[in-house]
Amino acid sequence: MIREQRLDLPHGISLNCRMAGAPGQPLMLFLHGFPEAAFVWDELLTHFSQAEHGGYFCVAPNLRGYAGSSSPTDVSAYRAKHLVQDIVALKTALGCKDPLSGLVAHDWGGAVAWNFANQHPDLLHKLVIINSPHPGTFLRELKSSAAQQASSAYMNFLIRPDAETLLAEDDFRRLWAFFTNMGADTGPHAWLTAAEKDKYRAVWNQGLTGALNYYRASPLRPPRADDPAAQAITLPAEMLQVNVPTLVIWGMQDIALPPGLIEGLEAYVPDLTLHEIEEGTHWLVHEQGMRVAGLMQVFFNR
């Protein structure tokens, strides 16, 4: 059974969390992306909390800026170092003294998780990434690939000062398109039911500014005539290496994050298991949640 708890962290941030399983069991954290919230993990929280699937203590926070968690007004509060700090503090607040058994993440949650694994490999046994680019390959593609620049052009829309207003128009029409453009309502793995829409509306009606501030705080976006963005960035090698066993699950039909982003990933992640799902899109957790769970189970049982 899923339960909710708000946790106050020592640095002044509070995170609303969804959780399943018994505190004290090996801890697995799940980090959502944009424009989602912790509820997207409910099926996996329940699955991995069950004794026959490992009996983990499974926790999914609403990241800062989302769905009742703290939403600082300063855009700089959404930089990676602060987001990683939240997860380190959350681990401690949950009473976990051992390394995390697993950190599972998608989209923006993956950006946080890649950084966490780079900075704190001693706090983590295994990393699972679902359609979230490693900063090294993402920077390379944003600089050199016209296709990736086009695929990521929406980022420059999301940093507009009026993005919140535009996204909320006409019952969030533009936000629904993030899903329906990849078959969420009509594809072979359609998942965007009326009930799911109600869950999203409940999140979005609490405000969009925190979620959009992730994009505003990051220079990893396509360059424009008036903004060099990614072209102005160089990331040192020590910020890119991930020295924990990592499973990357990639939906190959992701129109925002195409497969070029997984090329050369092994240069940054020596212990890499890569599983490509040919018909999958960016929304794999919705489309094929139990297939994702099965791949994770094999990885965690290794």
Task: Give short role names for the model-derived ranges.
Residues 1-28, 49-57, 270, 297-302:
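Alpha/beta-hydrolase fold catalytic core
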Residues 87, 91, 292, 296, ...:
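Hydrophobic "lid"/C-terminal helical patch
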Residues 35, 54, 121-122, 270, ...:
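Proline-centered flexible-loop/turn and helix-kink motifs
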Residues 2, 13-15, 40, 59, ...:
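Flexible "cap/lid" subdomain of the alpha/beta-hydrolase fold that forms the substrate-access gate
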Residues 18-70:
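Conserved HGGG/HGGXW glycine-rich cap/lid loop of the alpha/beta-hydrolase fold
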Residues 280-289, 293:
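Catalytic histidine-centered segment of alpha/beta-hydrolase-like enzymes
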Residues 8, 21, 62, 131, ...:
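Residues at the C-termini of beta-strands that transition into short coil/loop
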Residues 44, 116, 295-299:
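Hydrophobic residues on the short alpha-helix immediately C-terminal to a glycine-rich phosphate/catalytic loop
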